[in-house]
Amino acid sequence: MLPLLKKLYLTFARSSRIIITLVIIDQLSKWWFIDNLRWKPDLMLKFTSFLNMVYTWNYGISFGLMREYYQYSNAIFLITNTIIVCYLYYLMIRSKTIGSFAGYSFVIGGAVGNLIDRFFRGAVFDFIHFHYQNYSFPVFNLADCFITIGVIILIEDYYSTKKVIEEKAKGNYDNAQIEAMAEKIRNTDKGGNDKIASLQN
């Protein structure tokens, strides 16, 4: 029981630093752009020819989906996202690699950042807008970036771990083959020596 509690405490202590840092960065960025963009003409701040900061409230899910069902979707996604965050935290506690631990921490940090928006503001604030000529990428925020980074880390960690396991299994298989061949040679040599000994007798 004590080792389990110690593991839970250490996991909480390590992950909290990452998650809280990401949430603070996300919320500070939203606070700054909410405070500054609302007074800009067209609610927009142009950074480059392909990047704008825009004042946008997302009442749906990612990329503005289901915004027409806002009065139902906000409560539903508050509940479902909270459940998902709790499940991800459970997976993080069980993670066995640094990569998976970091990946889950980033995903949880981003998810909590957007959950705070939904709970206190009733919608998620998005402000980063990439566009090129006639193409316009859906507006997003730093929390979405953290979630994406976390997913990429988890995918990379999965395939790296899988490769290590396969190489280890292959190494064990090769060692078993070598041992079997050595045993066969020893048996063959023993049989040959017995025949020689019988001839000598």
Curated annotation (Swiss-Prot):
Membrane topology category: Multi-pass membrane protein
EC identifiers of the protein: 3.4.23.36
Active site positions, chain numbering: D126, D144
GO molecular function: aspartic-type endopeptidase activity
Annotated catalysed reactions: Release of signal peptides from bacterial membrane prolipoproteins. Hydrolyzes -Xaa-Yaa-Zaa-|-(S,diacylglyceryl)Cys-, in which Xaa is hydrophobic (preferably Leu), and Yaa (Ala or Ser) and Zaa (Gly or Ala) have small, neutral side chains
Cellular localization per UniProt: Cell inner membrane
GO cellular component terms, A-Z: plasma membrane
Pathway per the UniProt entry: Protein modification; lipoprotein biosynthesis (signal peptide cleavage)
Subcellular location, principal: membrane
Record GO biological process: proteolysis
Alphabetized UniProt keyword annotations: Aspartyl protease, Cell inner membrane, Cell membrane, Hydrolase, Membrane, Protease, Transmembrane, Transmembrane helix
Record field: transmembrane: 73-93, 97-117, 135-155
InterPro entries: Peptidase_A8
Family assignment from sequence similarity: Belongs to the peptidase A8 family.
Record function comment: This protein specifically catalyzes the removal of signal peptides from prolipoproteins.
Protein name in UniProt: Lipoprotein signal peptidase
Gene giving rise to this polypeptide: lspA
